[in-house]
């Protein structure tokens, strides 16, 4: 019975080994690119027949379970089997799969792969931004940038709070306060302070409620817990309290300058990835030699025995427990953890774990080591899961979120570093010192674009993006116009310069106690040198940027250029020194790139073509704008039967030499005009007079002139010339201007007289209408009063007679009274001219009779149909 069991184990182990070797060969050929797919119905019948799939990548876990079950793994304790590395699954009987007498060792094990890759074209959402969308996106970008600048100034102002600084100094051990007395500050002097901050404060992932930042900072100091921004601000306040020149540095993660960029980031799979914080790859954050080790807290007596400024053990690797603690803290506090080697994914790690389990299951064929082998399999599983831990790097990995990306840190000026001192990068959250070269990779891993990095001090700000961005060409197109950005930062740079070089003076200026203009020139001269040295350093970084490895980067690169990616109106002249090669293409300095124009375009700059010059480039003219260009240039060069455009460089031009004006005659072109693109295009001895209808004055005096054509107006695919003023000889300038001024005065006088006459006519009409109204009132006022008195008497008599009549009868009586008034009014003077006003008209709806009345009492009844 025992030999039968051993034969089963040997045959099954051999089959497992053959299957694993095949899987390893196929996975190495494919590079583990497919996604792992678990087979839930992998029974013995399917293993005999095999399953056809698109690829081969996922190992059947059922095989390993059968091997472990047959080798006695069922005797393991329940506590060990409940580990998260194991899962329950049905185990088919071995009798159906292994025949005791006839075992076919050559049968194959087929493993399924799912190599379905989503089509990138289907995932890409087509979005075409309009001109209005682009303008709106640029405005949003600028407003967001200004808001983040204001936020940085608020944080910097809170760091100068004397109460917060005093509270931090009261918590700081006395041996760490000696750094304020040092004349030369180095990196090793700041390391103990940073270590103390990391030991006494922790990062809280949830931000504070809606409070002012100063209040939130005080609460974080009291609770020893806060956001990454608050901890960075506390570190700045602590170092400033120790009289160290410190700046608060922040990445301004503004809205995208392109309209559809933010929309695409938050749609589809990107939204899910940002929600769960899972990235495909992990990026190097900082070399472990530069990371500050976090050791457990020691007693005060033990700490005092050490030197207060002992150099940190940067070269000694951390222990295994410390590595695990640092990984947990990094993933919670700053969105950082341990990364896998290269670009391995979760599926690759799981795949290797299963292979390790299968290999360990077939490594030992003895029954006596069942439990030990099971523990060994579990140990190998844990090791394979943590095999991505490297002793040389600390990096970001799965679980990082954009909200936890390294957005803020601080810079400390160490005058003991180098000869002139330098600004040292200090990250109090992640425990990094002088690791500025790793910020770009950390921001990229956390899905943060490193477009603007601004340092704040005493209400001022300075752009230090060049210090942390090594690939400027990747962000240059994502930044706003440099002219606008420099104009915004101009007043802030002045404040920051004073803050980083003289803290007391800058603080008084920021609080309004001392104006900036009262600063002593002697104290600012040395400080200006430090600022100039920093500007020189940033400019040097820009000029010494490494060559991009992607050809597309050379299209709009500020320093380098490739001839292949030049515009059609650009050329290399001269072909300067070759700085390197990219995919076999030589790389030239951007200063060698020259812009080509037509000779008519060069005339606008006051340049003309030299004699015997050959066009540097000939381009085919677009048929859509052919007529426009022909009319504008006045020349239609036909080369080989097609309309072409000859382009010339600036080195082929010379200053414009036009014929001078002689005997008061203005030289004109073939169209009888002068093209005045600029003042350089005027013929010698002439002047351009930009006044409307001034040609009439010159024509009246018989002075020679030429219309001045200043440009074109494009409408409906055509060009219309724009004329403004005239060109005359210089000697006639004063005469024409005086005559034009006199003519303008005459026109103004005529206009004034015309307005006065029109006003007098309107007043006459108004007064005449008033007189007519008064005359009519005086003539007919008495007659109208008598008629009203008589009508009142008639009405009173009618009312007395109709006292006992009902309401409808009273209305009829009133109508009869009105008729009697009409009869009496007929006996009046026939010479009276009756006037019927609309206000005196009445209408009876029952009888459909309209009554018209005059002021004298005369009335007329009209029946309307």
UniProtKB/Swiss-Prot annotation:
Record-linked InterPro entries: BHD_2, DNA_repair_Rad4, Papain-like_cys_pep_sf, Rad4/PNGase_transGLS-fold, Rad4_beta-hairpin_dom1, Rad4_beta-hairpin_dom3, Rad4_BHD3_sf, Transglutaminase-like
Knocked-out gene: effects: Probably lethal.
Keywords annotated in UniProt: DNA damage, DNA repair, Nucleus
Keyword DNA repair: yes
A GO CC term attached to the entry: nucleus
Basic and acidic residues: bias regions: 37-57, 806-833
Localization of this protein: Nucleus
SMART domains, per database record: BHD_1 (SM01030), BHD_2 (SM01031), BHD_3 (SM01032)
Location, primary (coarse class): nucleus
Acidic residues composition bias: residue spans: 76-88
GO function terms (MF aspect): damaged DNA binding
A Pfam family per the record: BHD_3
One BP annotation, GO: double-strand break repair via homologous recombination
Annotated stretches, region: Disordered: 21-57, 75-101, 290-318, 804-833
Chain positions of motif Nuclear localization signal: 34-41
PANTHER family: DNA REPAIR PROTEIN COMPLEMENTING XP-C CELLS, DNA REPAIR PROTEIN XP-C / RAD4
Subunit structure: Interacts with CML19. Calcium is required for this interaction. Binds to RAD23B and PTAC12/HMR/PAP5.
Role, per record: Essential protein. May have a role in the nucleotide excision repair (NER) pathway. Promotes UV tolerance via dark repair mechanism (nucleotide excision repair).
Family under the similarity heading: Belongs to the XPC family.
Protein name, UniProt field: DNA repair protein RAD4
């Amino acid at each position: 019975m025992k030999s039968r069991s051993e034969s089963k184990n040997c045959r099954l182990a051999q089959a497992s080994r053959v299957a694993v070797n095949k899987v390893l060969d196929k996975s190495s050929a494919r590079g583990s690119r497919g996604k792992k797919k678990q087979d839930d119905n992998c029974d013995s019948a399917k293993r005999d027949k095999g399953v056809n799939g698109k690829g081969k990548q996922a190992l059947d876990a059922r095989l390993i379970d059968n091997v472990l079950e047959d080798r006695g793994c069922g005797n393991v304790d329940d506590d060990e089997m409940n580990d998260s590395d194991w899962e329950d699954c049905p185990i088919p009987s071995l009798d159906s799969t292994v025949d005791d007498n006839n075992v076919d060792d050559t049968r194959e094990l087929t493993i399924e792969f799912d190599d379905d890759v989503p089509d990138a074209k289907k995932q890409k959402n087509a979005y075409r931004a309009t001109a209005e969308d682009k303008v709106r996106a640029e405005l949003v970008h600028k407003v967001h940038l200004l808001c983040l600048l204001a936020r940085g100034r608020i944080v910097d102002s809170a760091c100068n709070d004397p109460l917060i600084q005093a509270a931090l100094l009261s918590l700081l051990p006395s041996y760490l306060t000696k750094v304020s007395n040092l004349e030369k500050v180095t990196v090793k002097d700041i390391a103990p302070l940073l270590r103390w901050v990391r030991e006494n404060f922790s990062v809280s992932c949830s931000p504070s409620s809606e409070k002012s930042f100063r209040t939130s900072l005080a609460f974080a100091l009291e609770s020893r817990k806060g956001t990454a921004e608050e901890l960075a601000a506390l570190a700045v306040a602590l170092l400033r309290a120790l009289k160290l020149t410190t700046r608060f540095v922040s990445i301004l993660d503004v809205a995208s300058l392109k309209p559809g960029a933010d929309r695409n980031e938050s749609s589809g799979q990107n939204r899910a990835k940002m929600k769960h914080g899972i990235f495909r790859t992990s990026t190097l954050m900082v070399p472990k030699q530069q990371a500050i080790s976090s050791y457990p807290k020691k007693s005060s007596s033990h700490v005092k025995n050490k030197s207060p400024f002992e150099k940190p053990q940067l070269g000694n690797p951390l222990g295994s427990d410390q590595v695990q603690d640092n990984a947990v803290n990094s993933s919670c506090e700053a969105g950082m953890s341990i990364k896998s080697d290269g670009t391995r994914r979760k599926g690759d790690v799981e795949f290797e774990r299963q292979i390790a389990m299968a290999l360990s299951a077939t490594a030992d064929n003895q029954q006596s080591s069942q439990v030990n082998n099971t523990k060994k399999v579990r140990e190998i599983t844990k090791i394979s899961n943590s095999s991505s831990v490297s002793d040389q790097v600390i990096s970001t990995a799965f679980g990082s979120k954009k909200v936890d990306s390294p957005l803020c840190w601080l810079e400390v000026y160490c005058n003991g570093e180098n000869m002139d001192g330098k600004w040292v990068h200090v990250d109090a959250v992640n425990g990094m010192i002088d690791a500025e070269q790793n910020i770009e990779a950390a921001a990229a891993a956390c899905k943060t674009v490193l477009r603007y990095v601004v340092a704040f001090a005493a209400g001022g700000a300075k752009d230090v993006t060049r210090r942390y961005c090594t690939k400027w060409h990747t962000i240059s197109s994502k930044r706003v116009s440099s002219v606008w950005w420099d104009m915004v930062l101009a007043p802030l740079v002045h404040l920051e310069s004073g803050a980083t070089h003289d803290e007391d003076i800058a603080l008084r200026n920021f609080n309004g106690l001392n104006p900036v203009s009262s600063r002593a020139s002697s104290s600012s001269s040395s400080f200006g040198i430090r600022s100039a040295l920093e500007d020189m350093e940033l400019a040097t970084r820009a000029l010494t940027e490494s060559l991009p490895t992607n050809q597309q980067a050379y299209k709009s690169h500020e320093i380098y250029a490739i001839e292949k990616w030049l515009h059609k109106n650009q050329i290399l002249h001269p072909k300067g020194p070759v700085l390197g090669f990219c995919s076999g293409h030589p790389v030239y300095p951007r200063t060698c790139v020259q812009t080509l124009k037509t000779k008519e375009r060069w005339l606008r700059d006051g340049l003309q073509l030299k004699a015997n010059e050959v066009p540097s480039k000939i381009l085919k003219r677009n048929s859509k704008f052919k007529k426009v260009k022909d009319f504008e240039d006045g020349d239609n060069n036909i080369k080989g039967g097609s309309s072409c455009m000859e382009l010339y460089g600036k080195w082929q031009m010379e200053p414009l030499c036009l014929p001078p004006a002689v005997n008061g005659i203005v030289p004109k072109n073939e169209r009888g005009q002068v093209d005045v693109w600029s003042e350089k295009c005027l013929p010698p001895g002439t002047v351009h007079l930009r006044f409307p209808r001034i040609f009439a004055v010159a024509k009246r005096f018989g002075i020679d002139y030429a219309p001045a054509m200043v440009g074109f107006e494009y409408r409906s695919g055509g060009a219309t010339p724009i004329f403004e003023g005239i060109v005359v000889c210089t000697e006639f300038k004063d005469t024409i201007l005086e005559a034009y001024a006199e003519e303008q005065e005459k026109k103004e006088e005529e206009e004034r007289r015309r307005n006065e006459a029109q006003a007098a006519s309107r007043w006459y009409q108004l007064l005449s209408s008033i007189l007519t109204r008064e005359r009519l009132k005086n003539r007919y006022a008495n007659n109208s009063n008598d008629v009203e008195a008589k009508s009142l008497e008639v009405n009173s008599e009618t009312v007395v007679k109709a006292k006992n009549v009902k309401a409808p009868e009273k209305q009829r009586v009133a109508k009869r009274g009105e008729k009697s008034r009409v009869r009496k009014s007929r006996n009046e003077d026939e010479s009276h001219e009756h006037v019927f006003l609309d206000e005196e008209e009445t209408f009876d709806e029952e009888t459909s009779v309209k009554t018209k009345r005059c002021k004298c009492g005369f009335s007329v009844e009209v029946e309307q149909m």
